[in-house]
């Protein structure tokens, strides 16, 4: 697909506000990268004096296919560098415009909402045309956007207490349509095997995440001293780990777990409850695979393999068999798509991680 260039006729973005300017026939390179629940960008190179190159200016938009199956997406131009009669263009998907809209917090306490209910009740400063949907029906106490001022982007997934932080779903964007899903992608009956269709992979182990203990603490209000104090729980020991010395990871318990809880340092009331909360938080932290990771990153770039995977999408799952006979399922966590050639340049699979939840006393 030859990329198209547009300008907007309104500060309130919508598909109807996009005014078509022409085709970038002088485009020599156009690559779209999308990462799971993260950045969504397009980089392009255009010959300076080619058709519509004069329309390649910041805050105009490039429309291009991001992968073999999705509709063309709009990307806002935010940087243009001219060198040797070539324009190097950097853009970001219109989803990033969510960070330019503030949510006015008007509530005095957190609201119990499902993701769709929460979005419906937001009070945004600027009108917008994002259409939100979700198949997640669980309800949780949500502060962001209700008791805490934040941007729309922070509310969706850019901060602690966001929908992504609370519900752990996966986003799929189709221009202004936002889908927040329990799980995105399909399980594919496809195997990547060392020595067969994997030519290389990278395994990284770091002592920074190899520890012996996790020590969680919480900050709560003391009714006796009339001030916030910190209560620490006994460290959880992780055994069968590779740490040969005592190596402690200090973990602050998220405020949302102890919100509204008070203690009395004179009588001791509330202390055991808070310590138990710290212990549970430490267990969840360890079980969440944030520690002791051995990462095996696989990047698929061989054309023959990419041909087999052309109809795959971000978050699809495949089976990987490595040289040490380890077999595991892994999600596609990043796609790099050549819009001009209409094929993937690279697919990156998620890391395999050592699970520490089985090693906790």
Can you say where each PLM-predicted feature lies in the sequence?
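Ser/Thr/Gly-rich low-complexity blocks that favor extended beta-strand/coil architectures
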Residues: 61-74, 221, 320-329
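Trimeric viral appendage architectures of receptor-binding fibers, tailspike depolymerases
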Residues: 1-26, 35, 207, 347-361
